[in-house]
From Swiss-Prot:
CDD domains: FH_FOXH (cd20022)
Residue ranges, annotated region (SMAD-interaction domain (SID)): 307-390
Designated gene of the protein: Foxh1
InterPro entries, alphabetized: Activin_resp_transcr_regulator, FH_FOXH1, Fork_head_dom, TF_fork_head_CS_2, WH-like_DNA-bd_sf, WH_DNA-bd_sf
Protein name: Forkhead box protein H1
Description of how the protein assembles with itself and partners: Interacts with the MH2 domains of SMAD2 and SMAD3.
Amino acid sequence: MASGWDLASTYTPTTPSPQLALAPAQGYLPCMGPRDNSQLRPPEAESLSKTPKRRKKRYLRHDKPPYTYLAMIALVIQAAPFRRLKLAQIIRQVQAVFPFFRDDYEGWKDSIRHNLSSNRCFHKVPKDPAKPQAKGNFWAVDVSLIPAEALRLQNTALCRRWQNRGTHRAFAKDLSPYVLHGQPYQPPSPPPPPREGFSIKSLLGDPGKESTWPQHPGLPGQSTAAQAGTLSKGEEGMGTGPSSSSETPLWPLCSLPGPTIIEGESSQGEVIRPSPVTPDQGSWPLHLLEDSADSRGVPRRGSRASLWGQLPTSYLPIYTPNVVMPLATLPTTSCPQCPSSASPAYWSVGTESQGSQDLLCDLDSLFQGVPPNKSIYDVWVSHPRDLAAPAPGWLLSWYSM
């Protein structure tokens, strides 16, 4: 159609202006200002661009003296015998007077050198007048050229902390009496050490000192009946015989071969002596298991120590750990019909006699006073089908608690 609208005739392509075409390349955007390149950076680049700040090393072992280096140098020089010191001597004297300078901090030595050369009050005293430029010269101080404020306590962080807390000041307020008038200077006393907590040293103490264990006054043979029967909780199984304070062992278990018994007094007035304990590893003090009787027939129950039920036999001092202790034979007077523990009939290995089952029941009740042996218990548990008789009921109930 001639009269119709021609799309191709009306369409004219447009080309961008040179300014807009070059805008992205030059960092400009249309209708906007310059492009911010920092917003387009990845976060990793920002973290790398920021260098971490180094933490300042702090020296908190001792309080820094609240004095000027001029005052401290003048103090040690005036305290010298000839009122002069070398540089190395000044450094050593400052370290001796003020503990702060004994630490790892070394920068203060440069401050000493700087103050010696920059202050007019310090002057060199040549060691050899013919060689004034030689090293190792002495330094002296002219006290008339020292400013008065340089010898006073400075307004440091330490002084401000003292004022806020109201604590005792360890340093003198003014060094003028010590520098100008030659009074002896007393270094600040170190703070008291902190109170020690619980430690093994507090229990053991110093071997050179006397024992701190409580002593029980009294002569042998005059102890009370309570001491003759049983021991105190802290002294069970340990001897407390009469001895001087200098000979008292600090740790009684280390010097005694085994448990001993306190001497007591029977009801008849007879003094009961402790029975000897054999240090042999293969034997066991049988007198601790049975009640021996004296010649008059009076049982000596006062000499029996209450050791059973306190510790397993493997932990007693006369036996090494996990050593099987031989079972003690029971007294014949307590059970005349009971077979010996060493006989095969007792352990059901040999031929059993008539009524052996009843005897084992009696043994179960009689062995209530015998201490349990953990090593024997372990053997019984690990070998339940052994030929030997099963463990008594009291032993199983002892370790099942």
